[in-house]
Amino acid sequence: MPSQPSDAPAAGAAPAPDPWWLPDVSGLTVGVVGGTGEQGRGLAFRWAAAGLPVVIGSRDPSRAAAAAQEVAAATGGDVRGLGNAECAAAAAAVLIAVPYAHHRQTLMELAADLAGRIVIDCVNPLGFDAHGAYVLGVPDGSAAEEAAAVLSGSRVVAAFHHV
């Protein structure tokens, strides 16, 4: 697993005394599972442009490689494309940006690779038909709560839930 920032408090230690303390994450690799879609690719682009190493993941590694090449060419960043499991294993923080229809299954398949990592879930539980998008019910309450339930060994946070 990628190492934690050297200035981070030890696991299980009390929080830093300074409430404004933040670890230096400038060298940490960010993974984007679902990085070939609009939202995942857009966030990968922004992180690469900011200088973070990025790994784009996809069920189809060749699509991930093509997306990574596009993002790297546009940003000059360190961007690689891999399969979803390899993406999850290569990154310290991993964004989940897959369609809700594949959310639970993807998380279940990646649970071991995501253990101990920060997982950022940006999935909105939406379905689509001829009339457009509609909200889907989620037994766990929200997509992020579903992710937290499936990924009990990860630190799950919710972000980037724009529609």
Predicted regions and their residues:
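A generic structural signal for alpha->beta connector loops
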Residues: 51-53, 76-78, 116, 153-156
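Active-site phosphate/pyrophosphate- and oxyanion-stabilizing loops and adjacent acidic/basic residues
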Residues: 69, 108, 145
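Rossmann-fold NAD(P)-binding glycine/threonine-rich loop
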Residues: 123-163
